[in-house]
Regions:
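Conserved alpha/beta cores of soluble small-molecule-handling proteins
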Residues: 1-174, 178-181, 204, 208, ...
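Glycine- and Gly-Pro-enriched alpha-helical subdomains that act as flexible
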Residues: 174, 181-203, 209
Length: 285
């Protein structure tokens, strides 16, 4: 059976899953989304993802036309309908169809879309051997303009930095904020290890509050590792003993080179490996 896509209470074959060309999600990137993983048929931290979705929607004055409980059920039903156990879920809420102007008050009912599929963001060898990344010249959105804490459908800021990375032969790129501090990568949060401590930029550096980021911080603290959410600059990354990225799609992936600087000994480090193991164990609980 073709992949089934959920759109506002109905299921459609992948080829027939359509929304209006007047939807402001398409015309202006006006909407919010979440990317989630399922392991063994269970969505990892579904409640946390839905809480973040609701926060993003509230921040842009978008009312999600169903309860969290109903949406959670729809996500699980869509997974089951497609027979997916270990997969990726893309949950989208658009503003709905409106006029060609910006006025969101002219939009009709918001559209809720659920896509369940499989994803492999990076090749297996990158998880085994580590990524090489570069710093993009594209600055992460200033929080006073469009907060990175809002997971909106407008990802052009990230895409521009992603293009820079790809043009440099890298699949991921590091983004700085307007103050020149390390923010995050185009689709992942960043961590470094220095002298046995785990360091990561704080939320007010202009980053998305990653669900996987939070999980890794919890795992590190449970393992008695000191975790500091502090301001970092590129120099801190260059001289780190280890570096890794986290994200729902990426999970936990090591970084072994940044801007041509070798991180540590150029191999995924012991802390990275241990936290990766702990994370994979957590997802199966």
């Amino acid at each position: 059976m073709p992949l089934q896509i959920y759109i506002s209470g109905k299921y459609f074959d992948k080829e027939n899953a359509k929304i209006s060309v007047y939807d402001h999600g398409l015309l202006y990137g006006d909407g919010v989304f979440e990317g989630m993983r399922s392991y063994g048929g269970k969505v990892f931290r579904l409640k946390a993802h839905l809480d973040r979705l609701w926060d993003s929607a509230k921040a842009i004055w978008l009312t999600i036309p169903m309860t969290q409980e109903a949406l959670a059920q729809a996500v699980n039903d869509t997974l089951a309908k497609n027979g997916i156990k270990d997969g990726y879920i893309r949950l989208v809420v658009t503003r709905g169809a409106g006029s060609l102007g910006l006025d969101p008050n002219k939009c009709s009912d918001p559209q809720v879309i659920i896509i369940t599929d499989h994803i492999q963001l990076y090749p297996k060898e990158f998880y085994e051997n580590g990524l090489t990344i570069v710093t993009a010249s594209t600055i992460r959105n200033h929080s006073a303009a469009l907060s990175p804490r809002i997971k909106s459908l407008n990802y052009l800021n990230n895409i521009m930095a992603k293009i820079e990375g790809l043009q440099a032969g890298c699949v991921e790129a590091l983004m700085l904020n307007a103050q020149g501090e390390v923010a995050e990568c185009t689709g992942d949060n960043i961590f470094i290890v220095k002298r046995g401590k785990l360091l990561t930029p704080p939320i007010d550096a202009g980053i998305l509050e990653g669900i996987t980021r939070d999980a890794v911080i919890e795992l590190a603290r449970a393992a008695k590792l000191e975790v500091l959410e502090i301001s970092l600059v590129k120099h801190d990354v260059y001289v780190a003993d280890e570096c890794f990225l986290t994200g729902s799609a990426a999970e936990v992936i090591p970084v072994i080179k940044v801007d041509s600087r070798i991180i540590g000994d150029g191999q995924p480090g012991p802390v990275t490996k241990d936290l990766t193991r702990r994370f994979h164990q957590l997802t199966r609980e």
